[in-house]
Curated annotation (Swiss-Prot):
Changing residue 165 to A: Shows poor substrate selectivity, allowing additional amino acids such as L-valine and L-leucine to be efficiently transported. Decreases L-alanine uptake. It catalyses: D-alanine(in) + Na(+)(in) = D-alanine(out) + Na(+)(out); L-alanine(in) + Na(+)(in) = L-alanine(out) + Na(+)(out); glycine(in) + Na(+)(in) = glycine(out) + Na(+)(out). Disruption phenotype: No growth on L- or D-alanine. This is Sodium/alanine symporter AgcS. It comes from Methanococcus maripaludis (strain DSM 14266 / JCM 13030 / NBRC 101832 / S2 / LL). NCBIfam families: agcS (TIGR00835). Residues 33-67, 112-148, 203-206, 275-300, 379-386, 431-453 are cytoplasmic.
Amino acid sequence: MDFVSLVNTVNSFVWGPYMLVLLLGTGIFLTLRLGFMQIHTLPYALKLAFSKHQDETSEGDISHFQALMTALAATIGTGNIAGVATAYVLGGPGAIFWMWVTAFFGMATKYAEAVLAIKYRTVDDNGEMAGGPMYFLEKGLPDHGLGKILGVAFAFFGAFAAFGIGNMVQTNSVADAVASNFGVDPLITGFVLAIFTAAVILGGIKSIGKATGIIVPFMAVFYILAGLVILAMNIGYIIPAFGTIFSSAFNFSAGFGALIGTAIMWGVKRGVFSNEAGLGSAPIAAAAAKTDHPGRQALVSMTGTFLDTIVVCTITGLVLTIAGLKAFPGLTDLTGASLTAASFDALMPMGGLIVTIGLVFFAYSTVLGWSYYGEKCFEYLIGTKGIRLYRIAFVLVAFWGATASLPLVWNIADTLNGAMAIPNLIGLLLLSGVVVSETKAFNEIRKNEAKNA
């Protein structure tokens, strides 16, 4: 077996049915243990996330909002444009429904990750917060060295996955899109991306937090508004589009079992790719937030899954479904970002250009968010002395990624990304009692706050 075949085999195993069951199963388990908390706490969580009065006095490096925007920067990426289209093509419109299901249970997973990340976070040699699965695994599961082993495994996979899925794959997508639409040489695009990446990440988490606090709201609103305009222009197709999604998710025609199975597989897989619930990446950003209690920031982190999948991915999914219902010629031969761009373009003048611009911002912000994730994993492994070197390497790889051919790199990074989830999910299941305890304590704080309000 050659190296490429080996990578593909390992990738198929890592992202096979067992992983998808583990990811979704952990979300269901945590949802039950936490009493479906994502339903009754979502309004309060959204209020916390977007409140003008951010916590500036508690321990931490950045605000609630900046921590959420940093996580969303890494989360809202090409998966929201290309990933949804891939799920739509390979799993049918019903895959979108299963993305919603994954997001619902993933909100509990994202909440639990953040609770543990903040509870077990520490201050590094530079005086900055350091947290995430590697720390809560080591501190929360100290017996027989299991936690340390799992923590090192997570950090190793995360440090290298950041260069692939969070860097080269993103800059390559930008270079391809800009070259296709504007004829710009990938070398030029790569150079510009490297300069802009360096300008932000060399300043550390505070610089990243400030940048993502501006870029993410702008790019999300820009893309969502464009999608809403298309939906308004095709308002008569919205209900039929939802009908198509639901009927495809529960297709009771001949061979429905295989059809439903395919829809579930691609919906869950692309849903996880999009919102990253269970991968263990987002809690690294949550650990940097200024907060008085793990539960408070965890609720803010939970909204990331809602905003990413229930809002942004739904916009993409509805546009794709409406374009499919209108049966525009040429769409059936496309997939990924090309299908999304063509669908937007068919339904609105300059729609394809909007998708291209959105893709550029989404991918660039992903590079910023993942640079911090990779840096913190690297720091856990070798200490703070190598951080600047890691940042410089990240900038250089951003340039290389824009000009390289990446099929093998994508599969390796994809595999490492999935491998991150395994130690993280083990930790979430074994430490679920801690999450429940912290949640009960925070609920008491909220009750007292309500009485004194």
